[in-house]
Every structure is written in structure tokens, then in C-alpha cells.
């Protein structure tokens, strides 16, 4: 993980984040990951998918930002997009509640899978604030340096162009609100879609419809939140 051509990173992000790859925290993070691999630990998502959120959604294409915390830590789940799982994997409980709100808000049929890649391809930056995790060990890579990198991503997006939508669900995501210029963007907050909190304000928040209305009011095409069958 340096700023050279070995980084498989979409060009606009590579340029915008070039200085981050030279920061001391990145060297420490790289060494931590090297040691984890050397110790035989299984790390998710697979290496080529760590930057999937950035590679799927170039900086100029970002319309909506959804923040998650860290990747799913079960086999074949994480693929670099927050809340999303790879095809063929059962839909996680928080995503089930996201689908329930989509159905309630926009009458979108609940899909038979949990892969949100089509959202990312349309301009939804689906960013976890920690980009790796050890198998079966939730939050095991929190505080290891990724938070500095993803904080900078949020700042870059906020500064790059106006009239974006930030969906901040739960206390962790809302802790990043200070990185967003709310005078330029629409920031929508609610409790997390987890089964522990979804019925305390996530279900019924109307965020998907409100996001599209804001985009259209500012001359941007809305997101098609429907997911293709897989």
C-alpha cells in the first residue's frame, strides 16, 4: 500500500488520496496487515476487494455516501461495500431492515440476495470506516489506521462537489458528521438498521426517497434503488 502503480485503485481516488499513502499511519497499517497474514490469520475482504467501494464509485460519480463500520467477518460475506454481501450469501439482519424500509418508502420489492453492487455502480459510495477485519473477530482492525484513511475520503468527497447526500445510520456513522460540510450537502441521520435499533427510528425514516428528491432538485439523476435479480 504505497502511492505507486502497484495500488489497484481507481485513478481519480488514487490522485485524490495520493498523500495519504505516504503518511506514517499507512506504513504502520501496512505492517500490521503483513504481520496478520504472516501469523496465518484470514483477513476479509480478499485483498483485491479491499478498495471495492472506491473502485466501483469514482470520485466524480459520487452522489450518495452510506457509511458502515467494519466488514462482515464471516466467510464469503465481505466484498468491500458496507452492508453488502457477495451473491449466494444469506442477507444479513441489518440489510433485511434496509430492504424493509425500501419497501415501505418506495415500494421496492425485496430482492433475493444481499449484493448492493448496482448501487455502487450508480454513484452510491458504500464506505466502511475500517476496511479490513479478521475472520470471526468483529472490529479486530478498528483503531489500526484505517480510520484516518476513511476520514480523509469523507473529507475529500465533501469538498469535491456540492449537493451530495450522506446517510449516517447509528452513532458510529454520525460521529463522522463533523467531516461533512452540511451547508453544501444533505445529511440524513437515524438509528442503525440493526435489529437492536431499527424499530426505534430507522424504519420509517424515508431516507431513500428523500435522497432522490434532493438529487433531482439539484439536477442530478436519482438512484435506482431496485436491485437486479441474481
From Swiss-Prot:
Superkingdom, taxonomy of origin: Bacteria
Entry's Gene Ontology BP terms: base-excision repair, AP site formation via deaminated base removal
E.C. number(s) listed in UniProt: 3.2.2.27
GO MF entries: uracil DNA N-glycosylase activity
Reaction catalysis annotation: Hydrolyzes single-stranded DNA or mismatched double-stranded DNA and polynucleotides, releasing free uracil
Any single Gene Ontology cellular-component annotation: cytoplasm
Classification via Pfam families: UDG
Main location: cytoplasm
Cell compartments where the protein resides: Cytoplasm
Annotated keywords: Cytoplasm, DNA damage, DNA repair, Hydrolase
Active site: 70
Gene3D superfamilies reported for this sequence: Uracil-DNA glycosylase-like domain (3.40.470.10)
Biological role: Excises uracil residues from the DNA which can arise as a result of misincorporation of dUMP residues by DNA polymerase or due to deamination of cytosine.
Classification via HAMAP family: UDG
NCBIfam families, sorted: PRK05254.1-1, PRK05254.1-2, PRK05254.1-4, PRK05254.1-5, ung
Homology family: Belongs to the uracil-DNA glycosylase (UDG) superfamily. UNG family.
Protein name: Uracil-DNA glycosylase
Gene: ung
